């Protein structure tokens, strides 16, 4: 089993954890329907980039 030679410093620990923060997802507003949606996803109405993609 691997055992570390020396205790990692607070600086090294912080540098390792620098990318662990949670990021908020980007929300977009459709220009036709005005609904919010995730980027590169269709709205609940079936619109994508101003065009009707899905029929209900």
Curated annotation (Swiss-Prot):
GO terms for biological process: translation. GO terms for molecular function: structural constituent of ribosome. Residues 1-34 are annotated as: Disordered. It comes from the Bacteria. Keywords: Ribonucleoprotein, Ribosomal protein. InterPro entries: Ribosomal_bL32, Ribosomal_bL32_bact, Ribosomal_zn-bd. The keyword Chloroplast does not apply. This is Large ribosomal subunit protein bL32.
């Amino acid at each position: 089993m691997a055992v570390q030679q020396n205790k990692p410093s607070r600086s090294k620990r912080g540098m390792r954890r620098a990318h662990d923060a949670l990021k908020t997802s980007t929300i977009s507003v459709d220009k036709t329907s005005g609904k919010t949606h995730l980027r590169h996803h269709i709205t609940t109405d079936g619109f994508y980039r101003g065009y009707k993609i899905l029929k209900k």
